[in-house]
Amino acid sequence: MIRSWGLFILATSCLIIMLFMVTNNSQKIPSLESLNGQWIGKHKNYEIILAIKKDSKCSLELRIAPSNKVEKFNGDCSIDSTKKPYSFIMTNIIELNTSLYSLVASKNNNIIHMSDFSTKWRLHPVTLTHENTIIFKRYI
């Protein structure tokens, strides 16, 4: 009888610990407010600067490393948190006739991971992989 109670308590403790670990490791939902500021990342031959302002306006600057050529896009940003991974959407882009779509994952207050940008919703990546991930660091 005492042995069965001991096993019951041990099993219950293990279950509580596993639940605690799962809930603590869940990915935080990034909000535009938490992403406000300037972010810098490098991907392939590009240095990428993403600036998110408090009024949901944002700019994306792509600098091609060897030539120093710069492409800049200005628009409105939002995050769709209805599905995981979360989508970062840049709309009303002055320089383009289309929107830009990406995935976003907040690693901590100073690092975010984003996928390559796509001009079509159906063609944007569905997961973050080593090949398609841009690691942005907050510029302080």
Task: Please provide the spans of the model-predicted regions.
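Short, exposed beta-strand-loop hairpins at the edges of beta-sheets
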Residues: 113-130
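Positively charged n-region of N-terminal signal peptides that target proteins for export
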Residues: 1-7, 77
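Short, solvent-exposed mixed-charge patches
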Residues: 139-140
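Hydrophobic membrane-insertion alpha-helices, especially the h-region
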Residues: 8-21
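N-terminal helix-cap/turn-to-beta initiation motif at the start of protein domains
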Residues: 24-38, 51-53
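Structural signal for glycine-centered tight turns and loop->strand junctions in beta-sheet-rich domains
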Residues: 54-58, 83
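Contiguous, well-ordered beta-strand patches that form the walls/edges
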Residues: 44-47, 64-118
